[in-house]
Amino acid sequence: MGLGLHLLVLAAALQGAWSQVQLVESGGDVRKPGNSLRLSCKASGFTFGGYGMFWVRQAPGKGLDWVATINTDGSSQWYSPAVQGKFTISRGNSQNMLYLQMSSLTPEDTATYYCAR
Protein backbone atom coordinates (compact mmCIF):
# COMPACT_ATOMS: atom_id res chain seq x y z
CA MET A 1 0.00 0.00 0.00
CA GLY A 2 1.36 3.41 -0.95
CA LEU A 3 1.87 6.24 1.48
CA GLY A 4 -0.35 9.21 0.75
CA LEU A 5 1.36 12.32 2.09
CA HIS A 6 -0.92 15.27 1.50
CA LEU A 7 -0.13 18.95 1.84
CA LEU A 8 -2.92 21.46 2.04
CA VAL A 9 -1.90 24.59 0.13
CA LEU A 10 -3.31 27.62 1.88
CA ALA A 11 -2.76 31.28 2.65
CA ALA A 12 -3.24 31.86 6.35
CA ALA A 13 -4.08 35.33 7.65
CA LEU A 14 -2.59 34.94 11.09
CA GLN A 15 -3.51 38.30 12.59
CA GLY A 16 -7.14 38.66 11.56
CA ALA A 17 -9.11 39.21 8.40
CA TRP A 18 -7.51 42.62 7.80
CA SER A 19 -3.99 41.27 8.02
CA GLN A 20 -1.60 40.92 5.10
CA VAL A 21 0.35 38.18 6.87
CA GLN A 22 0.44 35.09 4.67
CA LEU A 23 2.08 31.67 4.86
CA VAL A 24 1.64 29.66 1.66
CA GLU A 25 2.78 26.03 1.62
CA SER A 26 3.70 23.91 -1.39
CA GLY A 27 5.35 20.63 -2.22
CA GLY A 28 2.77 18.11 -1.06
CA ASP A 29 2.62 14.87 -3.00
CA VAL A 30 1.99 11.15 -2.69
CA ARG A 31 5.06 9.12 -1.82
CA LYS A 32 5.77 5.46 -1.19
CA PRO A 33 7.10 4.40 2.23
CA GLY A 34 10.83 5.04 2.51
CA ASN A 35 10.80 7.90 0.03
CA SER A 36 11.59 11.57 0.61
CA LEU A 37 9.75 14.85 0.09
CA ARG A 38 10.47 18.53 0.69
CA LEU A 39 7.78 20.98 1.75
CA SER A 40 8.17 24.74 1.30
CA CYS A 41 6.44 27.70 2.90
CA LYS A 42 6.59 31.23 1.48
CA ALA A 43 6.03 33.96 4.07
CA SER A 44 4.96 37.53 3.44
CA GLY A 45 3.54 40.50 5.29
CA PHE A 46 5.89 40.38 8.28
CA THR A 47 9.60 40.46 9.09
CA PHE A 48 10.26 36.77 8.53
CA GLY A 49 13.76 36.79 10.03
CA GLY A 50 12.41 38.14 13.30
CA TYR A 51 10.34 35.07 14.13
CA GLY A 52 10.96 31.49 15.09
CA MET A 53 8.99 29.24 12.75
CA PHE A 54 7.22 25.92 13.13
CA TRP A 55 5.84 23.00 11.19
CA VAL A 56 2.77 21.23 12.55
CA ARG A 57 0.72 18.43 11.04
CA GLN A 58 -2.74 16.95 11.27
CA ALA A 59 -3.26 13.29 10.50
CA PRO A 60 -6.67 12.28 9.15
CA GLY A 61 -9.21 12.37 11.96
CA LYS A 62 -6.66 13.60 14.51
CA GLY A 63 -5.66 16.86 16.16
CA LEU A 64 -2.70 19.09 15.38
CA ASP A 65 0.74 17.76 16.31
CA TRP A 66 3.92 19.81 16.56
CA VAL A 67 6.62 18.61 14.15
CA ALA A 68 9.59 20.98 14.32
CA THR A 69 10.75 24.47 15.27
CA ILE A 70 13.62 26.61 13.99
CA ASN A 71 14.98 29.77 15.59
CA THR A 72 15.26 33.14 13.87
CA ASP A 73 18.65 32.68 12.22
CA GLY A 74 18.36 28.95 11.59
CA SER A 75 21.13 28.00 13.99
CA SER A 76 18.93 25.88 16.29
CA GLN A 77 16.23 23.34 15.50
CA TRP A 78 13.95 21.22 17.67
CA TYR A 79 11.99 18.13 16.63
CA SER A 80 9.16 15.95 17.79
CA PRO A 81 10.43 12.51 18.82
CA ALA A 82 8.28 11.06 16.04
CA VAL A 83 10.35 12.79 13.33
CA GLN A 84 13.75 13.22 15.02
CA GLY A 85 16.44 11.96 12.67
CA LYS A 86 14.03 11.75 9.72
CA PHE A 87 12.94 15.33 9.11
CA THR A 88 15.03 18.49 8.79
CA ILE A 89 13.64 22.00 9.21
CA SER A 90 15.52 24.87 7.56
CA ARG A 91 14.92 28.42 6.45
CA GLY A 92 16.11 30.98 3.93
CA ASN A 93 15.64 34.39 5.50
CA SER A 94 16.64 36.30 2.38
CA GLN A 95 13.84 34.56 0.45
CA ASN A 96 11.33 34.47 3.33
CA MET A 97 11.17 30.69 2.95
CA LEU A 98 10.71 27.84 5.42
CA TYR A 99 11.42 24.22 4.47
CA LEU A 100 10.78 20.74 5.79
CA GLN A 101 12.91 17.98 4.29
CA MET A 102 11.19 14.66 5.02
CA SER A 103 12.95 11.33 4.55
CA SER A 104 12.29 7.68 5.37
CA LEU A 105 8.57 8.37 5.17
CA THR A 106 6.18 5.93 6.81
CA PRO A 107 2.39 5.62 6.76
CA GLU A 108 2.37 7.42 10.13
CA ASP A 109 3.66 10.55 8.35
CA THR A 110 0.47 10.81 6.31
CA ALA A 111 -0.99 14.19 7.27
CA THR A 112 -1.75 17.73 6.24
CA TYR A 113 1.32 19.82 7.05
CA TYR A 114 1.15 23.50 8.02
CA CYS A 115 3.84 26.09 8.61
CA ALA A 116 3.26 28.57 11.42
CA ARG A 117 5.01 31.39 13.21
Swiss-Prot record:
The lineage of its organism: Eukaryota, Metazoa, Chordata, Craniata, Vertebrata. Residues 86-117 are annotated as: Framework-3. Gene3D superfamilies: Immunoglobulins (2.60.40.10). Keywords: Adaptive immunity, Disulfide bond, Immunity, Immunoglobulin, Signal. It holds the Pfam family V-set. PROSITE patterns: IG_LIKE (PS50835). The keyword Disulfide bond applies. Residues 20-49 are annotated as: Framework-1. Residues 1-19 form the signal peptide. This is Ig heavy chain V region C3. One of its GO terms (cellular component) is immunoglobulin complex. GO terms for biological process: adaptive immune response. Residues 69-85 are annotated as: Complementarity-determining-2.
